[in-house]
Amino acid sequence: MGFWAKSLRIFKCLCDHGTLSIRQLAQRTDVAKSSVHRLKQAMERRDIHPESWVWETEVGHQWLLRLIVATLYTFGLKRGVGLDTMSEFFTRLRLARQVGGSPSALRQVMQVLETALLETAGRWEKDGVAAGEVREIIGAVDETFLEQMILVFQDVRTGYIVQEEGADDRTYTTWKAVVEARLTALGAEVWYLVSDRAKALIQLAEQGLECLSMPDFFHCMHDLVKSYALTIGQRVRQAQHELTKAQETLARRHAPHSLDGSEREARAIVEARQGEVTRWEEVRTAYRDHLATLSLTLHPFRIADSAPQTSAQVANQLQATLEAITALAQRQQLPARYDAMTKVRKQVPALAALVDLWWQGVHQDVEPCVLSPRWRQWVDECLLPMVYWGHQVTRTRCRRRKATMQAAWAATRAAFDQHAITQRLTPDVLAEWQAWALQRTKAFQRTSSAVEGRNGYLSQMHHNQRGLPRRRYKVWTIVHNFDCRAADGTTPASRFFQRTFPDLFEAVLSQIEDLPQPRRRKHQVALTH
């Protein structure tokens, strides 16, 4: 029986029977007289605040345990708050006499918490793998640099971090060894891999995993923006500055009842400067329209009529838009960005290849159903575009592109509702079809933004805690996979393994039985801690 269990038994006995001698307490609680004496003295030392008696009860002690562990878990593990800060927090709550709240004592609890997390997540992952279903991963791979280089491999569709592993290098051999070992343990396969086009990552996809190497579309767009957006923006600001100067000159030369030559000249200059502003604003608008066209082109459906499109059609449209950007830059005599444009053009075939691969997955799913041409037309031209655009609307922040997608969704929704097959299906069957369509929609991933965001989170946490033991990295992975909840309440692990898991915090809380004992120190020292 531990320290706190004996204390709770003694306090309950005192509450039930009133004042008792040490001998009587020992007899009723089955605790040695010497222990009863020490524990009773400890209770008296803790009883210095009006609420102190609450923590001596079983309910109060359980709540105190939850408070300590929840603080360490939420603020320490998930937010990177230091132990010194949390120790001060517990002191402000007047808990220094109730429980060990020093940084060293909290560190012990944190270590127990980390061990419980590692063991719990290990069991749950084995349970998920034991289901025996071969999982199809849409991988995003990248590396981040903390105290050592960390290789990050994430399933983009579910958000599940497949692997976060420290490594000395990022060569193809290292990546292949790390990824293949993890895939074997999970019984999973990679459908395609999204990356920043590092040579080792391209080789990993095409040779190691034998899948499509998908360029990160965000990186492509970023390369285009770096090429011309800054230059065009500078021309707009320069033209606006010249217009402001011309207007100020005109205001100084303006006379109430005269129109001499100098004022006419100033007005002409203002009109010319206004023309330059209009010209460069139109150039900027045209450039942004081209960028929006690129973004709206790389989809399984045409944005204009939501008709299914192929990789060849997408590639032609992307190349045509890139040529339009180049022509715009040449007409406006902007600095040539040959290397950047060539880099983007070379990635167009791999970008467009995702469209045919996505349709291949769709056809593999519906092939066992042996659909008639009319049913296939309903799936390809009504159901899938309706669900796809509806999902993309929720993910798009740009107001212009969102409005365009909303218009496409509204049109497909109307066609879907009016179709004879839609009207004939029961609500349950229709819901199953829509759930399947949503899963296929989520399989179209153009960027590795999730893994980039993960890298930023790791860097921020590492900065907050001024470096961490390597063991903490695995704990962060577990917290992300099993306790990072989406709006619908699901976690990456529940989406990846397609099953529910208990609440991670409650699971580890049940494994922590005792809290550290408070220090025996003078009252004044405790107050000034």
How does the language model describe each region?
Residues 6-8, 12, 17, 22, ...:
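Acidic/histidine-rich catalytic cores and adjacent linkers
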Residues 40-43, 110:
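DNA major-groove recognition helix of helix-turn-helix
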Residues 212-228, 431-444:
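RNase H-like polynucleotidyl transferase catalytic core
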Residues 52-194, 198-217, 224-328:
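RNase H-like nuclease fold core
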Residues 2-20, 65-81:
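Short, amphipathic alpha-helical "recognition" segments used to contact nucleic acids or chromatin
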Residues 24-29, 86:
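Short alpha-helical "recognition helix" segments of helix-turn-helix
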